[in-house]
């Protein structure tokens, strides 16, 4: 048994963990690292040039158009974005509604679970960008207060 102190949100917990086959895992890891490091140094120079252009080209084309519509929120407003991808089951507010911090704005279904999306602060709903049945991606703006 090994003991660890784990800090979660400022609270320290003492955790005991039982090692199961720990010696077997540690032995192959040590020889693999030195063998990979010398082999990677000469080979890394050639492959590094090929992968770098491919990832740079793909993200530049796709995220740029998606970011511009999401960033069009009025100054001084609060945006409520999707914390995870999912499907909008219901929208509980409409433009002009006054909401308080913690009020449920909409229900987002993700991984077969219904998640209540709540107002982060008091305000008035100025825009609702989703409808029931819409699919959203992580970071999509759903409501503007």
Swiss-Prot record:
Alphabetical list of InterPro entries matching this protein: Biotin_BS, Biotin_Carboxyl_Carrier/Decarb, Biotin_lipoyl, Single_hybrid_motif
A matching Pfam family: Biotin_lipoyl
Domain Biotinyl-binding positions: 77-145
Transmembrane segments: none
Cofactors: biotin
CDD domains noted in UniProt: biotinyl_domain (cd06850)
Pathway: Amino-acid degradation; L-glutamate degradation via hydroxyglutarate pathway; crotonoyl-CoA from L-glutamate: step 5/5
A molecular-function term among this protein's GO annotations: glutaconyl-CoA decarboxylase activity
Protein task: Biotin carrier subunit of the primary sodium pump glutaconyl-CoA decarboxylase (GCD).
Protein name: Glutaconyl-CoA decarboxylase subunit gamma
Organism: Acidaminococcus fermentans (strain ATCC 25085 / DSM 20731 / CCUG 9996 / CIP 106432 / VR4)
The gene coding this protein: gcdC
